[in-house]
Amino acid sequence: MRHLIRAAALAVAVVLAAVLVPASPASARVDSRTRPIIFVHGLDPDWDFDASSNCANWNQLMTALRDWGHNAPMHTMKYYAQDTNCTDSMGSTDQNTSIWTLGYLLADWIWDHYTVRGIPVDIVGHSMGGLIARAALANTGAPGWPQYLLVEDVVTLGTPHQGSDSAYGCWYTQCEELRPNSAFLQSLPENPQGYGGTDWTLVGSDSDLHVQQSGVGMTAAHKVMYLYPDYGHSDYYTDTSPLEDADVHWNNGAGWYAWYSALRVGKWTDYALTFGTY
């Protein structure tokens, strides 16, 4: 009888292991333009208590990425109740919803649509959207959260990794969490990883008056700070020029270097999503 019980327990353990571990672990990176891309917008700071973002803001960048060879599904995520023109919804919230909760909603969506099927994804987050991605990966394995996520690349555009003084201008929960040294930011792990590894690229701009150096203020394998063009906070997804005339400071883990003929932000995003060394 004991042998039967042990055999049954072992069978259950094997089944659970099969459920909790991907059939094809993402242990080795594959450079390609074939992974689904999830686009996550940032905060709506308006005082109208009717939070909304227009996901069509991503259209120019998405069109360029397709022209450059990305042929997998692209998802623009709705999380405010009044968001418009989004392809997919991960919730119906407002500005008083904690970024931790938004991270959970994103993690749950990725799990249900891709990770459970063994498919890795990439994420592009603008502003607070980058922190939502960070929160999604940081808490996997916690009670009620997905056990893991298959996220190969994350690119953050103008994300206040160390907070933004502009967040003192509003009083929503999300604004409070975006302030420098907030309890949320202090509790948020740096460089959180998906199953098999996640390659982070942080993109900031010296002309982004809301974020500036905070845009590259997290431990990451790749960081780039634009000096020219003069990207403001809403310009990151509007420059899809193929020109290689940008002035940047960039860091791939060996210190900061100046580069005066770099890719512009749209094409840099393409390379960051495609190549693990860029």
Pin down the residues of each PLM region.
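Secretory targeting and sorting signals
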Residues: 1-28
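Lipid deacylating catalytic domains
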Residues: 28-278
